[in-house]
Amino acid sequence: MSVEQFINDQLHSIVGISDRSICQYVHALAKKAKSAPDLVEKLRDAGDFPISPAIQSFADQLMSRMPRQATSARQRGPTTAELAEQELNRLNRAVGVLEDYSASSTKTKNVRKRKESSSEDDEAPIKASKPGKSVKPSKSDDSESDIEAMEAKLDADIAERDALAARINKKEKDKTRNVMEKKRDDNKDKEGSSMDKLREESRRQYLKKRKVDKLEELEAIVHDDQTLFAREKLTKREKADMEYRKKVLEYTKAHGKAGDVMKMKRYHLPDASTKQIPSQYVEDDEEDFRPGGDGAKWEEEQLMASMLHLGAKDAKRKEQEFELLLDEKVDFIQALQMPGTNEEVVETEAEKKKMSIEETRKSLPVYAFRDAFIEAVKEHQVLIIEGETGSGKTTQLPQYLYEAGFCEGGKRIGCTQPRRVAAMSVAARVADEVGCKLGTQVGYSIRFEDCTSEKTVLKYMTDGMLLREFLNEPDLASYSVMMIDEAHERTLHTDILFGLVKDIARFRKDLKLLISSATLDAEKFSSFFDDAPIFRIPGRRFPVDIYYTQAPEADYVDAAIVTIMQIHLTQPLPGDILVFLTGQEEIETVQEALMERSKALGSKIKELIPLPVYANLPSDLQAKIFEPTPKDARKVVLATNIAETSVTIDGINYVIDPGFSKQNSFDARSGVEHLHVVTISKAAANQRAGRAGRTGPGKCFRLYTAWAYKHELEEQPIPEIQRTNLGNVVLMLKSLGIHDLVHFDFLDPPPQETLVIALEQLYALGALNHRGELTKLGRRMAEFPCDPCMSKMIIASEKYECSEEIVTIAAMLSCNAAVFYRPKAQVIHADSARKGFWSPAGDHITLMNVYNKWQESSFSQRWCVENYVQHRTMKRARDVRDQLVGLLERVEIETKSSTDTIKIRKAITAGYFYNVSKLDNTGHYKTVKHKHTTHPHPNSCLFEETPRWVVYFELVFTSKEFMREMSEIESGWLLEVAPHYYKGRELEDATNKKMPKNKGKSGKDLER
């Protein structure tokens, strides 16, 4: 009986269960154990085997059957042959060369040396087989060799993984794309031209001054000639010189007055300091061409003279003024008032404008607690900060710590934000307050953009970027203070950071941790961080009246538009409006409707200025929401839930809350991730209402009933970690060396099922081995700031030699925005332009064609306009692609190009083989594994083609579950790229099978 057969029988009798993997696991433990008690200890550490006398007896019997030499009183040293064999085995493991027992019998076999405790004769080494003879291994030897080969292969992969990580860390400083370094290089290139301009300007200023000096000198000489030498006898030459100087002086003065005398139009260089042209060189406008000039007045007089006037009959009748009525109206009832916490005098916009930056900083509520805050940070390592949005905690607290000397020794102060917009806008504001250029002392770091330098001491970043910094700096050695801001939002990355920074704080006593929250759940954070103290900062909030609708609204978008017009017509100015919507599409719909209605009403209403703000909006357009509102106008800010806490907008007195937001949810059973519009929580509703009382008493109009608020809204939002796919997070934690994910210190642990699915997906992608350890492929995947499927697609492009095309496709997919746009007035032209890029291979190749054509046009904006392509989306795709190309070199992938679309689609399938659908006999697409019904997206170029097999980027749920960005593939490719995941019978195509050629029976035959 072989050893594994013995283990299998014993486990059935002792534990009641056994399979091949458990037998191999116990066999491997027995091989590593030195004795039976040692084996019992290893089984106890495994935790799956109850230690009992039966287990101890099993360990004794198993160790007696193991092929090993017994220890004796006289130990002999290894022979030369044994040393050579050991060295050969070591080298084979290092290079990954594994023995194959299924090879030809003519190969020499290394026979395993055995030891027996009872026989002295067996102490002699077993000789290796002679080259001419064949030794047939037993089943036990085959099993042992398979395990050894697998273990050696895993060890070699781990060694390669560690070597790759070391090389990546070594290249980190040189290969990271940095905005400030690029700017410095550009400045060096421009130094020569700028110096030339400065010299030219300096020369002009010198010539002006020299002209005045020389003129005064000449006047003095002429004056001396007239007074000193008028009565003297002079030579003919001296008289000519005096006459010459006199003429030069006259001509010079006449030249200076030439512009005034002749009124000649000529170019004059403006003054360098004021940039204004002197008044004596500005010509008067001709009045005949001005409204109200002499010509216009003459025309009015002639027209009046030609018309018949009847005296009092022509007098203007005073029209009766009526109140402007709207066709639609939303009825509200006032339910309650949110009390204020600070009854300060409301400052006007003019008064705020007069305030300097320093005065503005001192006017914030947090300024009164500056000294107490610094003392609290010095006294405690972890501090929970509770302060309302607008109190100044995000912009001021890092500055206070910097001024208190927490950046000494080259350390930094970091502050995380859940959104890119918040990180960029806050960093820009702090840079203005510090008085430096953005990217020097104050910088930011977001996905695909790093605006920092070696001088940066205050660094704002997204929480995802701080997670990526853990890969290269697991102990955050360059930071003295780390502030996790907006902790109440409970984003996926923020929850992971809680566990990581809590662990770091235990062995880095010099690291200060600040956890900032804007809601009243600070006690939960305090208890998670070992009862850390809470530092409360009272906000500056005024009373807010809460209004609910009398009945539920069927269309909250239309109700929001009507409510905006109601407020604008009935509420006094000044007072801006903040509207919370779910996404870019709704924001653009409301913006367009407001512009149309304002245009239709014309001068009957005051000016209404709709301003959008969402993540994909360019920063220059986002900044418009912070600009002062013009006089006799009202600003309407259309925002996503980013305006709840991340951004503070002054001048808001009215808030419209439809009660909805977009939220990701992951279905663990089907493996599908949805983006749903869901109701907000009560905590979020109160945050939205509080925005109306930021600068003065305000009103909040909730587009739902008071009953719905009380019974349908949850108290707190569900943390993102409990409702999203954890594949990227698990890969990141594995890269950081955190293997026990079940016992990881989560603030709210994720569902066990979701965690298991993430591990299964990473194992299927090849990022993890069967021991749950990160592979070399997984370490390379972790370097890309993408989801695991996209990272695998990029790495698979190395095999198919099409990395240039794959990074282009990945960049276009990463933008999360529409590439094409369809103006309502030009729908036919827009659709025709889009079809010009279509490829029969699918949407992925179509996206690649769009980028390549734009690149051929030298990245022209005009080309985008002519082809109805979003220029903003294309610019972002170019930035993403540039960084992905840099990361290819970092993970040692050579950039190659290929025009073969089959290779490109195979690389896509290698990453997204999870997302494969098959057309069934009913004409519907169903996923291969879960038989989940999906539908082609109407904007897909394959919408009318219906290929048999397709791979898609993601599922988007609106009215149905649509496949976004799909491409046609062949079923055989799945066995090529994922033979471990798909079986041949799953990929059989029933349409290709022929029916048997059997003849049917006639009616007469049936009657018989």
UniProtKB/Swiss-Prot annotation:
It is found in: Nucleus. Its EC number is 3.6.4.13. ATP-binding RNA helicase involved in pre-mRNA splicing. Operates during embryogenesis. A motif (DEAH box) lies at residues 485-488. One of its GO terms (biological process) is developmental growth. Residues 374-538 form the Helicase ATP-binding domain. Disruption phenotype: Embryonic lethal. Defects in oocytogenesis and spermatogenesis. Approximately 80% of mutants have an abnormal somatic gonad and no vulva. It comes from Caenorhabditis elegans. SMART domains: DEXDc (SM00487), HA2 (SM00847), HELICc (SM00490). Keywords: ATP-binding, Developmental protein, Helicase, Hydrolase, mRNA processing, mRNA splicing, Nucleotide-binding, Nucleus. Residues 127-137 have a biased composition (Low complexity). One of its GO terms (molecular function) is ATP binding. This is Probable pre-mRNA-splicing factor ATP-dependent RNA helicase mog-4. Residues 104-146, 169-202, 988-1008 are annotated as: Disordered. It catalyses: ATP + H2O = ADP + phosphate + H(+). SUPFAM superfamilies: P-loop containing nucleoside triphosphate hydrolases. Residues 563-737 form the Helicase C-terminal domain. PANTHER family: ATP-DEPENDENT RNA HELICASE (PTHR18934), PRE-MRNA-SPLICING FACTOR ATP-DEPENDENT RNA HELICASE DHX16 (PTHR18934:SF83). Interacts with mep-1 and smn-1. One of its GO terms (cellular component) is nucleus. ATP binds at residues 387-394. It comes from the Eukaryota. Belongs to the DEAD box helicase family. DEAH subfamily. DDX16/PRP8 sub-subfamily.
